[in-house]
Amino acid sequence: MAQMYFYYSAMNAGKSTTLLQSSFNYQERGMTPVIFTAALDDRYGVGKVSSRIGLQSDAHLFRPDTNLYQEIAALHEVEKRHCILIDECQFLSKEQVYQLTEVVDKLHIPVLCYGLRTDFLGELFEGSKYLLSWADKLVELKTICHCGRKANMVIRTDEHGVAIKEGDQVAIGGNDRYVSVCRQHYKEALGK
């Protein structure tokens, strides 16, 4: 029976690596997965999912106006799809998360979503909020803070490495702009 999974973590826990490994596992068994990623994240090229360890794959793009159910149903009609993999799923809208539940419930295709739980202010992203509510399985991927404890928060920094306390929720960046830390070091960095 198909289910929807939400694999979440702070940055640098290996979400994209895990997604690419899952895709490989399906392909190795002669199955056809489909990878989607957010159009606004083009750090590694448009329509690419890349991991820090060098793995990469082409991906379909989703934008705020993409109807994921219709797009996946059309792909599935042409060729059977065995799994849908969504990278950067925190950028999904509430409606798109609902569309993915329809993929699971009507098309009977498993959907595996990978993304951040919260932003640099500790607030849930819209996509993450509804994945936490509607996913069948929640899986936390772990990374570590510089102190050795589990990192579950993300700090956005300026060009001098100083924590930023306000700004737009979405600002694409990697290790140059974001640091994963434990809650204690998050609060210390923001002066809370």
Swiss-Prot record:
It catalyses: thymidine + ATP = dTMP + ADP + H(+). Its EC number is 2.7.1.21. Disulfide bonds: none annotated. It is found in: Cytoplasm. PROSITE patterns: TK_CELLULAR_TYPE. It holds the Pfam family TK. This is Thymidine kinase. It comes from Vibrio parahaemolyticus serotype O3:K6 (strain RIMD 2210633). The lineage of its organism: Bacteria, Pseudomonadati, Pseudomonadota, Gammaproteobacteria, Vibrionales.
